[in-house]
Amino acid sequence: MRALLRDAQDQTRIALEVEEAVYDPKDNKLFLYTTSETCYAVSKVVRTNADSIIEELVMKGYSDLTQFESEQDE
């Protein structure tokens, strides 16, 4: 499973491949473990859609979608 996280302190985006996800109901946190045995504690899950993520990446200059040709179907 892949996850896109945002660092709580500096808002840096972190993309990672999750090896294991464990939910702790006592602390109300989700712990994501990677293949390099790094653990990320997730305290809030926000449901997003691909359009908003793509728009944000383009606006910040991380992605250039002008390289792809497109045409409208009739």
For each predicted feature, which ranges?
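A short beta-strand micro-motif
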Residues: R2-A8
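Short strand-coil-strand connectors
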Residues: A8-D10, T35
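Acidic, low-complexity, intrinsically disordered interaction modules
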Residues: A15, E20-E56, K60
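Short acidic DE-rich linear segments
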Residues: E69-E74
